[in-house]
Curated annotation (Swiss-Prot):
Organism of derivation: Atropa belladonna
Gene: atpB
GO cellular component: chloroplast thylakoid membrane; mitochondrion; proton-transporting ATP synthase complex
E.C. numbers: 7.1.2.2
Protein's name in the database: ATP synthase subunit beta, chloroplastic
Catalytic activity: ATP + H2O + 4 H(+)(in) = ADP + phosphate + 5 H(+)(out)
Keywords noted in UniProt: ATP synthesis, ATP-binding, CF(1), Chloroplast, Hydrogen ion transport, Ion transport, Membrane, Nucleotide-binding, Plastid, Thylakoid, Translocase, Transport
A GO molecular-function descriptor: ATP binding
Amino acid sequence: MRINPTTSGSGVSTLEKKNLGRVVQIIGPVLDVAFPPGKMPNIYNALVVQGRDSVGQPINVACEVQQLLGNNRVRAVAMSATDGLTRGMEVIDKGAPISVPVGGATLGRIFNVLGEPVDNLGPVDTSTMSPIHRSAPAFIQLDTKLSIFETGIKVVDLLAPYRRGGKIGLFGGAGVGKTVLIMELINNIAKAHGGVSVFGGVGERTREGNDLYMEMKESGVINEENIAESKVALVYGQMNEPPGARMRVGLTALTMAEYFRDVNEQDVLLFIDNIFRFVQAGSEVSALLGRMPSAVGYQPTLSTEMGSLQERITSTKEGSITSIQAVYVPADDLTDPAPATTFAHLDATTVLSRGLAAKGIYPAVDPLDSTSTMLQPRIVGEEHYETAQRVKQTLQRYKELQDIIAILGLDELSEEDRLLVARARKIERFLSQPFFVAEVFTGSPGKYVGLAETIRGFQLILSGELDGLPEQAFYLVGNIDEATAKAMNLEMESNLKK
């Protein structure tokens, strides 16, 4: 088996003019390789170690050049386990960076860091390859117009809107609905924007990656009958992989997303789960590469590595990559260098709350903790901004009153506060919404709610026009008209029971 061949500028396969070296040192996932004088590979070139281990099994380990050491030696990081490697083994310089398949043929498939399919569905039907190391788009290519990326999810669009071509941090513990929210976003971008998604599983649990794949097949995001109809490509470099793979798998996913943006001119959603593991993998190999550790033991190149990934995620005049990144916060310390460096790049945060999930309000997005730089009157308009601020004020006041309600009960509140609490509870329930991808589990059809409809609904609740409706009428509905229809149905049902 050979790694995906790359071609040099002349179109000649680099394997035809082999540049051979030898392994001279192995320290865990890091190898030193000696090459003949004058034939040194460039930094980021792909190398392949070939040979046989002690029991005669073939070895084929891809590496990436990280440092030129002098004395005709280079230091490289392995992309797979280095078990069985010995000094003196032959190393082939590919003459180009790791290249991965791109284009429509990647949809519905699962890849590893090298762009090799790992889903047992045969080879990928494409000859289009792209190197994982590229420079960010030039400033003149960027689309600097600020525009909102409508998701069709009420709580997100109203209170913490996403920027088209922006970066969003997704915070939440286990079991609060991260995966379902991610799948709904993948579904909605395909329906509303004709876009596709790329999911990069960076250093997370293999079981979760498998569960996500199964759930995507179940909900139709991946179409098993006609794989080309799928809406997402998956790239996994999970916890069991060596740090080299976890450090580069984010770039593999990003490269696939860039092709959809630049060549197909589509809107793309790029999911990275988890951006912290990207930093963690870099820190694991940093010391082995001989770099002095920086604050809290992280690599000294932390900001540069993060910047080189994040700056490629942007809107150009062709299309956009909007990125949603799950952020693990070690020991809940927001000042830790890894999350602190990530925050500098984010345009919005979506915080999932266990309290809301426990109440059964899904999506369990915390309306007061979630933020967005887009929520400004000059960007979203006065009407949207005013409505969002009034919703937040109402919910904040309700939060302040909850202790009093718990101790003394609702009756001890003033008339004004009782009215505010009733509206806040309606708002809280109206922020819930049935999802398309959860239809299989809930039985209720999913709803995509446009931004104008969302604003109209919350304005009606705030104005007091719907004070007479029961609060359960607002739970798990789409737009406000469905809430009024549900209220009428509830009334009819209660009359029939009488």
